[in-house]
Amino acid sequence: LLNSIEQSDIVSLRRIIEANGLVYLQEFIAAASGSPRDIRAFVVDGRLQGAIYRNAPPGEWISNLARGGRPTPCPKTRELEDLAVRSARAVGAIYCGVDLLESKDGLTTIEVNGTPSGKGIYDALGIDVTEAIAEHVCSNLDHRKA
């Protein structure tokens, strides 16, 4: 890969690093579906509540719902559930949205979001994740007398 980088790209990257001090690089993962979409899996208290596809608008590659993506139901599979729950545990999240991509090698976690919107899963599946969050909070309240 480094051999395919142009000298002008290296110069540009150096300028960006000098100006900003930090650069995050991310491996490109080709979508197995051929269409620009990802999966948002909602995990509460170690359990997968449900998952949606976030489909990019026509002609776009960004599938974020706030940027015009459209939520559709995503079937729960053992692989999806296992990876989403393990990803949530890896960062110590009680409630999160785990973003995954379908690649030729299977599912890949790309992000664990600690403040995901529940609108997409509600719109696509009718699941209100706030109920599961409230149940978790209530079951973990300290019931000692003051």
Feature-to-residue mapping (PLM):
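Active-site lining segments that contact anionic ligands and/or coordinate catalytic metals
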Residues: P36-D38, Y95, L107
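C-terminal active-site "lid" helix and adjoining low-complexity regulatory extension at the edge
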Residues: P75, R89-A90, E102-A146
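Phosphate-binding site of ATP-dependent enzymes
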Residues: L2-S87
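Protein kinase-like catalytic core scaffold
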Residues: Y24, Q49-G50, C96, T108-E111
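A short glycine-rich, hydrophobically flanked beta-strand micro-motif that places a catalytic Asp/Glu
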Residues: Q26-E27, A93-K104
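Gly/Ser/Thr-rich helix-start
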Residues: R47, V98, I127
